[in-house]
Amino acid sequence: MDLSAIFLGTGGSVPSARRSTASVMLVRGGRRMMFDCGEGTQRQLQRSVGLAQVDEIFLTHFHADHILGLPGMLKTYDLTAREEPLTIYGPRGLHDLFKTLGRLIGRTDFALDLVELDPGDAVPHDGARVEAFAVEHGMRANGYALIEEERPGRFDPEAAKRLGVAEGPAFAALQRGEEVEGSDGPVRPEDVMGESRQGRTVALTGDTAPCHSTVSAAADADLLIHDASFSEEEVQRAADTGHSTVGQAAAVAREAHVKMLALVHISSRYHVGTVLDEARDVFEPCVAPRDFDVIEIPFPERGEPTLVPNGAREGSNGPSGTLSEPVKEPEAAE
């Protein structure tokens, strides 16, 4: 099952010509999970993978640069006759937020469900879960970790044959975890299956100061997407505003033993090369994605996460499994 992180907005609190405000979309198989929806996010989608029918949205917190894209995108979905229900998750206060946003959006013809998550709460998916964890931003705020379950080990057909298991339905039954009969008695799945294989983990912090809860949630993760708002010269400002410096984000990644660190929420006043130099002095496997970059996350036995520059840009083939039928344009009003 393919897993990709599509970076729609990688900038700081103020959008710039090159970096939009916060939004990342994880695509796992055919499921699209959006994390934060800053101003202009639907335009970023239209310029990249298309205004795909996002399956669910996770908000880390309710500062404007993380939520201002919601009213426009939800209204567009309504105007284009979306039928599928949409669930939006966020910290406590989500219902209060939508008392205000609802006045802008109005009633939608598709079902819109709001679910508040506390740290430790999890949303189940097919073979995975999205788990909320606490971050430190001076207000109620969640990070999120997509955590896959372990996968069954590889089936060894030759071992099954040696135990007298006939090819066909019995092979399939063993791979489903069922016991079958062999030439000398029962054959259990563990007799012919290798060790369980590790799933993947992607952790996203949203805005946060460095904290132990992120280290715990991102332990041994394949990818950590972390706030990197300030250079080391502004460490006190980072502390005062509940953000992280580049070096602090790198230190969290090093302590968590992640495979790759992606730095986001980068201010336009910094040169990306300088940002990366600061981070790599602390943690080498580090990238600073730009808008429309993609990180492909393979299963652990198949390699390391890979940054694909402009991988989601309009006109490119895009990451595997992300493209969909375009949303129909609404008819012009009379």
Per-range role (PLM):
Residues G69-Y77, L101, H271-R280:
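Metal-dependent catalytic neighborhoods of phosphoester/phosphodiester hydrolases
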Residues E39-Y89, A111-D118:
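Active-site metal-binding motif and surrounding structural segment of the metallo-beta-lactamase
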Residues A5, D36, L45, H61, ...:
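Divalent metal-coordination and catalytic microenvironments
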Residues P15-A17, D126-S216, L223-I225:
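Active-site-proximal loop/helix segment associated with metal-binding centers of metalloenzymes
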Residues L174-E296, L323:
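Cap/insert and terminal regions of metallo-dependent hydrolase folds
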Residues H125-F133, F299-N310:
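Short, surface-exposed amphipathic charged segments that create phosphate/polyanion-binding patches used
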Residues N317-E334:
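Long, low-complexity, intrinsically disordered segments
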Residues M1-G50, E83-P85, Y144-L146, G153, ...:
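Conserved beta-strand hairpin/beta-sheet module of binuclear metal-dependent hydrolase folds
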